Amino acid sequence: MHDANIRVAIAGAGGRMGRQLIQAALALEGVQLGAALEREGSSLLGSDAGELAGAGKTGVTVQSSLDAIKDDFDVFIDFTRPEGTLNHLAFCRQHGKGMVIGTTGFDEAGKQAIRDAAADIAIVFAANFSVGVNVMLKLLEKAAKVMGDYTDIEIIEAHHRHKVDAPSGTALAMGEAIAHALDKDLKDCAVYSREGHTGERVPGTIGFATVRAGDIVGEHTAMFADIGERLEITHKASSRMTFANGAVRSALWLSGKENGLFDMRDVLDLNNL
């Protein structure tokens, strides 16, 4: 990677998240917007990426071909859909480009493809790039070690009506953080739906509840409930810019790293807390 500004490419440049990623890339010192990508046939192809994001003219035009931009970026930032991200991953692996992946909804094969690619390129892969959410994950680990053995643990998340996967990647990351602190595997203790005559709550499980409504950017709560008291740890996002800023910050952090799989805890050095 270059010693000068890190050049980033933004996938899905015309989407809500893509436009904010462009804004964040233009605002962060040490980062340069190198390329912007949209799907073939998009009416936005040829547009100036900065103008598209409401940030003024940049001279970077929106393209549809990875080959056309391969010399214009060092790190590829992708918040699209799993199938598209995996195609971009293969290209970046082939050409030695770093990646920041904020896409959610991968199946196990997709996650394994990311792990495999990290042998050759540097990747930051996180369910949520918000600083606050990642601090919350650390707090959940601490709370679970103290209270997890005797409380009922529930995770409640809410997002806008357009979100296509449930539970959210962040909710799953919360469950994984709690399960890991309790020396459990989430797949063995998660309860994702309750309907009809369910019987009493099974001790040691982690329940999930999902809300999809309106324009909610993202709200997540973990509840540790006992008889007589409960602890709730909540994060609420009011703007996607918090995710965009974290993603671009992650791209800058990848500077000088040749390979490896990282997450926001690495970027923020939370593992040493």
From Swiss-Prot:
The keyword NAD applies. Gene3D superfamilies: Dihydrodipicolinate Reductase, domain 2, NAD(P)-binding Rossmann-like Domain. One of its GO terms (biological process) is diaminopimelate biosynthetic process. The keyword Protein biosynthesis does not apply. Keywords: Amino-acid biosynthesis, Cytoplasm, Diaminopimelate biosynthesis, Lysine biosynthesis, NAD, NADP, Oxidoreductase. It catalyses: (S)-2,3,4,5-tetrahydrodipicolinate + NAD(+) + H2O = (2S,4S)-4-hydroxy-2,3,4,5-tetrahydrodipicolinate + NADH + H(+); (S)-2,3,4,5-tetrahydrodipicolinate + NADP(+) + H2O = (2S,4S)-4-hydroxy-2,3,4,5-tetrahydrodipicolinate + NADPH + H(+). GO terms for cellular component: cytosol. Its main location: cytoplasm. Its EC number is 1.17.1.8. (S)-2,3,4,5-tetrahydrodipicolinate binds at H160, G169, T170. Belongs to the DapB family. Catalyzes the conversion of 4-hydroxy-tetrahydrodipicolinate (HTPA) to tetrahydrodipicolinate. This is 4-hydroxy-tetrahydrodipicolinate reductase.
